[in-house]
Amino acid sequence: LIPDIFKFIPMYTLSKTERLCSKILIEELLASELSFIKYPFRVVYKISSIPGTHPARIAVSVGKKKFKRAVKRNRVKRLAREAFRLNKAILYNEIQEGKTIDILLIYLDNTIPTFAKTEKAVKAILQKIVARYSSEINQE
């Protein structure tokens, strides 16, 4: 029994259920038409009315051609997930109950970014998704 005051505090965690791991779901997401580029990421997302445990799920992809070593690919993925974890409140506050957004971030650059650069890009991405989401809701 959590007091109401704690419901408005964003959770700064990124659980397993908030990550997209299913190959089938990622393939469905890649077939989605909703995408844009916010350098250094290409963003593909899908809004669905299937209720889930969390309002948003995320996956990060880094190409093997850009970074040969898995250590470097994992570093970029870790930075992107951390930036999402800290800023997901931007997205969570706007999503209606019963809706979910699946997000795939595809890294485009050839260099390992700093956390500040990654966080700035992820914030801009989340704000753009919120803007597109709210305009889509207003059209319905």
What are these regions (language model features)?
Residues L1-E140:
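Positively charged, solvent-exposed patches that mediate nucleic-acid binding
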